Amino acid sequence: GTLCDTLAREHPDCIRVLHKPNGGAGDARNAALSLAQGDYVLFLDSDDSYTPEAFAVLSAALEQTPADVCYFGLRMTGDNDGAVFTDDLPLRTPLTLPETPALLLNRPSACIAAWRRTLFTDTDIRFRARGWGEDLCMTRKMLTAARSVVILPDVLYLYRQHAGSVTKRAIDANAEIMDAIDDVLTWYQARGLFEQYENELGKLCVDNVLYDASVRILKAQSTHPLLPQLLDFTAARFPDYRHNPYLKGYPARKKLVLSLLGKKQYRAVHMLFAAAGH
């Protein structure tokens, strides 16, 4: 807190500090949104940083194409130093969710985009105050409000992941992703958008709940009571998830893992990742 106050005194034109009780990342972001004044807002997680040229690149891009949301790439640092992630969608072209439903499938982090501030002032969309998946919930909802989305090929965000990071939290916390997905599905259903984006929402559920959460558990141990719950959750909300057209594009290894998970062959999945050195 002292360092923040010092920086604010040294740079009063661009730094303001709000001291509040710790309520998690989502709660902090919501509090900051009420103070934001610029045309766009960005979200920077602790330990992460922007590349030196990030703001110049963003400013030029948004001046040329003033989109409501402007995505950019990230590079992993720390344990996965050098890995680069960008979206496999048309670049530097204004997109909308109805025309490009695959926008729902891009990386869910709120930190890899500049968001027009009026998206928040004109809607009641905010971050979940607590629990895993606060980014996924906000970003998947906000895409329905955005009139235009632009994706830049530039890697502007440096994401640091290490053994103590939130993304490597306790195994039991994987249950929270089910709450996050349910929050998104309920939101789309309430607005009559579920059927329009059912395939995309189904893939979102398969990826985040059935695959990612199960794999995080099975890389660490061969059994856990949460594993069948993840499968039952997915099957209850998307009974035909195995026939989702997006799943045809999965790599062979991921298809194999999903098949084994669907048969509750958890030990086989554990051994598969153990053999690969995970």
Regions found by a protein language model. Name each.
Residues 18, 150-152:
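General small-molecule cofactor/ligand-binding pocket signal
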Residues 2-3, 20-36:
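Glycine-rich, basic loop-to-helix element that forms the pyrophosphate-binding segment
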Residues 41:
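Short aromatic/hydrophobic "clamp" motif used to bind/position activated sugar donors
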Residues 1-19:
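Acidic donor-binding segment of Leloir-type glycosyltransferases
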